[in-house]
Amino acid sequence: MTALVLAGFLGAAIIIVAFFANQQGWLASADWRFPAANLLGSVLMMGSLLVQWNAPSVAIEGFWMAISAYGLVRSLRA
């Protein structure tokens, strides 16, 4: 398993933990850390897709990154 694939698993774990924390009420979606975690996770997952290409996954991760970046900017401006 390459470092990029491991990074992809780490990215998935970050996204899952952020989502779980949000569902538990521990991390509000308006908190800058929520979109930051989603952005970091999706960047790491995108890196793993360089090794194991999957066009639909690249598409969803691209949108996930863009929406997370937008949410992070909004959170930091508030």
Task: Say what each PLM segment does.
Residues 17-28, 69-78:
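C-terminal ends of transmembrane helices
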Residues 30-38:
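Cytoplasmic-side transmembrane-helix entry/capping segments in multi-pass membrane proteins
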Residues 1-13, 57-65:
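Structural signature of hydrophobic alpha-helical transmembrane segments
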Residues 1-2, 24-28, 50-55:
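Membrane-interface helix caps and helix-loop-helix hairpins in membrane proteins
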Residues 40-46:
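Hydrophobic, membrane-inserted alpha-helices
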Residues 16, 42, 65-68:
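Small-residue-rich packing faces within the transmembrane alpha-helices of Major Facilitator Superfamily
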